[in-house]
Design a protein with these regions (language model features):
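ASCE RecA-like P-loop NTPase motor cores
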Residues: 1-397
Length: 397
């Protein structure tokens, strides 16, 4: 009963989360810890800790009582005791909140009436832990990836894995250009006239036109990567019927759908297209004619209410530029990497976020892409541009 009261309390606290859709993710920061709601929650949390400690003691006593007669159950009872102790210690860690190595948060699945609650203590600086506990014990470590640099700089990666804290003489870096001819095989289009997302109807209407025109011009084989489910589902409802009338199949990563099945269908149906979320931003391979166009409607910045972002902003003045910006750049690089998977692949990357040309940080994204040039095109002209691009590349074959 005591533990159930804790989860009920977590669900009540989750009501404070703003801007959430199905899942509330709430930072347990100073404002929350000073609230009446938190103080009410502490009562049930302390009661639960006492109950867990008492249960742990009872299990230990049972181990002592049965060890001689039933040694076969001692291991199982020991596992139970360890779990009870870990639960109590983890709950103490979170409600105390004084260990600055962690950021604390709670999560609630709003689609469930009960059973979708959790509390988390997440290490805020993995690089520090690696530099102190792992890297000194390693004789040689090699990090290799196509998406480690931001504008050809390793600064963000080195900080993330702790290399900037073990001395410059102990590590070295090397940036190698790809053997693929990205300038010939990959086009980057920036639609800089998409309305502000806060004007939702104009924003969705403009994106709808871009998406319909792009799919029709490319004849399918388009992967559109969204940052949130609401935009994806609203645009799918608008775009799918129009594509269906043109004989083009469009699938969508619905709730509880299998990413593997969506991937297999996308690969097996060469002209099908897909609206997808996080699972398809990286690690998705569809070479050749299967994938000819990737569309990113919005840059994948973390939410300003994300607990890790909130904690970093509290501790550092320029946290957004140091963490959120390079992380978003790397995600776009990962998404762009879906297009060119072999030396013969070709395709178009469409970036439909006007911040790429209206904000100074837009250059970070564009200079981090594998191709050295991009086209800024009005959204109404994207369909025509793609028709010309497709005709030109089909003549080259």
């Amino acid at each position: 009963m005591a533990i159930a009261d804790v989860f009920d309390g977590v669900r009540e606290l989750g009501r404070r989360a703003r801007g959430s859709y199905d899942n509330a993710n709430l930072w347990i920061g100073p404002e929350l810890r000073e609230s009446d709601d938190w103080h009410d929650f502490l009562q049930s949390a302390h009661t639960a800790i006492d109950a867990l400690d008492q249960a742990d003691k009872s299990v230990d006593a049972l181990v002592q009582a049965v060890a001689a007669d039933k040694p076969e159950v001692v291991v199982d009872l020991g596992d139970i005791s360890r779990r009870l102790h870990e639960l109590a210690e983890n709950l103490k860690l979170i409600i105390d909140g004084s260990d600055e190595h962690y950021v604390y948060s709670l999560q609630v699945n709003r689609r469930l009436r009960a059973g979708g609650e959790s509390m988390t203590a997440e290490r805020i600086d993995i690089g520090e832990a690696l530099a102190n506990e792992w890297l000194p014990e390693v004789h040689t470590a090699i990090f290799a990836s196509a998406t480690m640099t931001v504008s050809k700089s390793f600064e963000h990666f080195n900080h993330a894995v702790g290399l900037d804290r073990i001395g410059a003489s102990t590590s070295s870096s090397l940036h190698l250009d790809s053997s693929y001819d990205f300038d010939s095989n990959m086009a980057v289009v920036v639609a800089g006239d998409i309305p502000d997302p806060r004007d939702r109807e104009r924003y969705l209407s403009a994106l709808e036109r871009v998406l319909v025109d792009a799919h029709l011009a490319m004849g399918g084989s388009v992967l559109t990567l969204f940052t949130n489910r609401r935009d994806m589902e609203d645009l799918y409802a608008r775009v799918e019927p129009k594509l269906a009338r043109a004989g083009l199949e469009l699938n969508c990563q619905q709730r509880n759908s299998s990413p593997r099945r969506l991937r297999d269908r996308f690969i097996n149906e060469p002209t099908s297209s897909l609206f997808a979320l996080k699972a398809f931003w990286e690690g998705f391979d569809a070479s050749g004619e299967t994938l000819r166009c990737v569309i990113i409607p919005k840059l994948p910045f973390s939410s300003p209410t994300d607990p890790l972002s909130c904690e970093r902003n509290l501790r550092e003045d320029r946290a957004w530029a140091r963490y959120s910006l390079p992380e978003a750049v790397l995600e776009v690089k990962q998404a762009a990497g879906r297009l060119i998977r072999s030396s013969t692949d070709c395709g178009v990357l469409i970036l439909a976020d006007p911040r790429l040309v209206t904000k100074g940080y837009g250059k970070k994204f564009l200079t981090s892409l594998p191709t050295t040039s991009y086209q800024r095109i009005e959204s109404a002209q994207i369909g025509h541009y793609l028709q010309l691009w497709r005709a030109r590349h089909e003549r080259r074959r």
